[in-house]
Each structure stands twice: as structure tokens, then as C-alpha cells.
């Protein structure tokens, strides 16, 4: 199959169209692609060095690694597993410190995930000053702890990540307690003057879940009562039949005496 190079030559063709006057306006992506042009070499080269760990993947196996301990012989022929394509062409995984801090924080604070999030895409150029935890226009959440930890590491306030994380975490606790206390005071003051608050989205969800649980409990109790009633009726009928038989047996000798 012939290699398709149309997408690679898009910068050259667009430049020709601009010079010839076929395009009146420069595309928005033109300067970006001109600064970072696409790769024109289509041959796959093995990635022998891991960019994250720096480990070299092209080392050959040592002969002692091919020794079979059971037969005391060396493996000299390639098997099916050895003939498989090595992972030298596979791109390395991207690992970031922020992801480790996020997973650690939300593993220790799972209830922070229940707080509502604003799913609005931003421009990515927000300039926050992480010398303090609170930011204008950004709610206090786990991301604040992550960015505050990175700032403490970069500024040199702490050399160890855990120490910086602990300081950011304690600052988060203090601000969260202050925020909850202010919300509680405002709620009590508003209630005192006659304000009525509707249930939140989380409370509404819990109420609907509790209704389902109550209905399930009623069905289970009714089923257990029905099963116990069937068992009792069977035992009672068997007991009545036994009593009637005993009465008949005791009545027959009396009739003979008469």
C-alpha cells in the first residue's frame, strides 16, 4: 500500500495557496504547524530508552538467564514467545506527579468526590498565585491541594513531597472548617428570619434512595410474614388432625363398654 503523504504536505500546499491568492485569510493553525512541522519520516524507529525512567530496553539477555534449572541446559532456540514483536515501538506511558497526588488525596478523602463540580472548559491560561491556598474564581477542592504542594516543592519550602503535601493538606483542613462554619452560621441566621431552603441535589438523591430501601424492606418483611404464616398453618393443620385422631381412638373403647 502506498504511503499517503497528503496530510504531511498540508503546510506546503497551504503556503502555495496563500502565495497564489487562492486563500485570502491565513488559517488559525498555520503558525502552529509552521513552528512545529509534522514528521516526514515514516520509518518506525525503536524507542530503546524510556523517557520517564531512562531505562535502556536494548540490552541482550545474559546466558545465565536462559539456564533451565530443572534440566541444567541452556535455551538456544527461540520459542513462540521470543518471536513476538518486542515493545520497542510502543510509546512509553506518561506519568505525572500531579496524578499521584490526586489519587492519594481522593483515596484519603473520598467524600470530596461527592461535592458538585463545574464542568466548564477553561482557556488553560488561568494565572493563579499558589503562594496561598484560596484563589479568586476557583473553589476550594483537591486540585488546590495538588497545586499548593507543587508550589511548595518548586519554591524550596520543602524538599520532600510528603512534607509539602502534609502542609498543603493541613491548610486545606483549616480553610474547609472555616468555610463550613461560615455556611452553618449563615444558614442559622437565614433560618432565624424565616428563610426556607429546598433540599440539595445530594439530599434529593439520598431521599430517593431511602424510598427504594424502605420499599424493599416492606417487601422483605411481607414475604417473611407470608412464609411464616404458611409454615404455621401447615403445623396447625397437622396438629388438629393428630388431635382428632387421638379423640377418635379414645372414643372407641367407651362405645364398646356401653
From Swiss-Prot:
Keyword Plastid: no
Domain of life assignment: Eukaryota
Cleavable signal peptide: none
Recorded GO CC terms: mitochondrial small ribosomal subunit
Biased composition (Acidic residues): 241-258
Keywords linked to the UniProt accession: Mitochondrion, Ribonucleoprotein, Ribosomal protein
Pfam families recorded: MRP-S25
Main location (coarse class): mitochondrion
Biased composition (Polar residues): 230-239
A single GO molecular function term of this UniProt record: structural constituent of ribosome
Segments of this protein annotated with the region Disordered: 230-258
InterPro entries according to UniProt: Ribosomal_mS23_fun
Compartments where found: Mitochondrion
Homology family: Belongs to the mitochondrion-specific ribosomal protein mS23 family.
Assembly and interaction partners: Component of the mitochondrial small ribosomal subunit.
Full protein name: Small ribosomal subunit protein mS23
Species lineage: Eukaryota, Fungi, Dikarya, Ascomycota, Saccharomycotina
